[in-house]
C-alpha cells in the first residue's frame, strides 16, 4: 500500500469551522514545534477565511502570521486554501493580482496550494495554477463535492482530468458539507486512482458523523460493497442510534 500523506488542517479549517477563525497566533505558537515533528505531509495554516479574520477581528497582520508559523515549522511544508479567482476574498480578482498574491504567499512560506472553485469551473482556477507552477509551488486541484442530478461520478472525473491537464500535482476531493458517504468515497477513490492517477486527498467534514468511516474506506482495498440505503435513511438511523434517551 502506498504511504499515506496526511495534511493537518487544525490551525486553518479546524478552527475556522469550529471557532469562526478566531484563533490568535499566540494560541498556535506553543504547539507548532511539536506539530512540526509529527511527520505530516503538510500543515494547512493559511488561506480561506484566515486572511480576512486576521484584519477584521484579530488585529493581526496575516503575512506576519504566515511568517511566524513557518519559522516554527521548518521541517513541514505549509499549505493554504485558495478560492481560485477569489483568492482569500469575496469577489473575483484580476489575473495580475492572482499572480502577485500566489507568488507572495510562496515567498512567505506556503508551498502547497489547495485551489478550489465552488462551481468546479476550471476557468476560475487557471490563473492560480499558472502562478503556482511558475513559482515552484505544489498545485493541489480541489474538487467541490456535492449531490445533485448533475454532480455525478463522471462529472467529477471530468473535472479531475481538467485539473490534471492544468498541471495539478495532486487532487483533493473536498467534502465541505459532510455529504460524501462511505460508499461513494470508495467508488470515487478507486475511480480517481484508476483514471486520473494523481496523489489523492479526501478533505472531510464531520457534519453528518460519517468522516471516520470515510477515512477507513479511502484507505481500504476491499472489494466494492452493494449500494447502501440513501444518505437520508442513513442519517435517520444514525440520529436514532445516537439519540440520548431519558432515564426511567
PLM feature segments, named:
Residues 6-11, 41-45, 76-83, 111-115, ...:
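Hydrophobic faces of well-ordered beta-strands that scaffold small-molecule active sites
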Residues 1-19, 66, 71:
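N-terminal amphipathic alpha-helix/helix-capping segment at the start of soluble metabolic enzymes
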Residues 34-54, 238, 247:
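Terminal or standalone catalytic/regulatory effector modules within metabolic enzymes
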Residues 176-248:
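Catalytic alpha/beta core domains of metabolic enzymes, predominantly
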Residues 33, 103, 130, 161, ...:
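Alpha-helical segments flanking ligand/cofactor-binding loops in enzyme cores
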Residues 47-164, 168-170, 178-182:
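Active-site beta->alpha loop and helix N-cap motifs at the rims of alpha/beta catalytic domains
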Residues 24-35:
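Short catalytic helix/loop segments, enriched in acidic residues and glycine
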Amino acid at each position: 500500500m502506498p504511504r499515506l500523506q496526511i495534511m493537518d488542517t487544525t490551525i486553518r479549517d479546524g478552527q475556522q469551522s469550529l471557532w469562526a477563525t478566531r484563533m490568535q497566533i499566540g494560541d498556535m505558537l506553543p504547539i507548532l514545534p511539536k506539530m512540526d515533528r509529527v511527520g505530516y505531509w503538510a500543515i494547512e495554516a493559511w488561506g480561506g477565511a484566515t486572511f480576512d479574520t486576521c484584519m477584521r477581528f484579530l488585529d493581526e497582520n496575516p503575512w506576519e502570521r504566515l511568517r511566524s508559523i513557518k519559522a516554527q515549522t521548518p521541517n513541514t511544508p505549509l499549505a493554504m486554501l485558495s478560492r481560485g479567482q477569489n483568492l482569500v476574498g469575496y469577489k473575483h480578482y484580476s489575473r495580475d493580482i492572482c499572480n502577485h498574491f500566489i507568488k507572495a504567499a510562496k515567498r512567505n512560506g506556503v508551498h502547497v496550494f489547495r485551489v478550489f472553485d465552488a462551481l468546479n469551473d476550471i476557468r476560475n482556477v487557471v490563473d492560480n495554477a499558472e502562478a503556482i507552477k511558475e513559482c515552484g509551488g505544489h498545485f493541489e486541484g480541489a474538487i467541490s463535492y456535492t449531490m445533485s442530478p448533475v454532480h455525478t461520478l463522471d462529472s467529477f472525473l471530468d473535472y479531475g482530468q481538467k485539473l490534471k491537464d492544468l498541471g495539478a500535482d495532486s487532487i483533493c476531493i473536498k467534502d465541505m458539507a459532510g455529504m460524501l458517504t462511505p460508499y461513494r468515497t470508495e467508488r470515487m477513490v478507486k475511480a480517481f486512482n484508476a483514471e486520473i492517477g494523481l496523489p489523492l486527498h479526501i478533505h472531510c467534514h464531520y457534519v453528518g458523523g460519517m468522516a471516520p468511516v470515510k477515512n477507513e474506506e479511502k484507505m481500504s482495498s476491499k472489494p466494492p460493497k452493494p449500494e447502501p440505503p440513501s444518505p437520508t435513511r442513513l442519517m435517520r438511523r444514525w440520529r436514532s442510534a445516537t439519540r440520548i434517551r431519558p432515564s426511567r
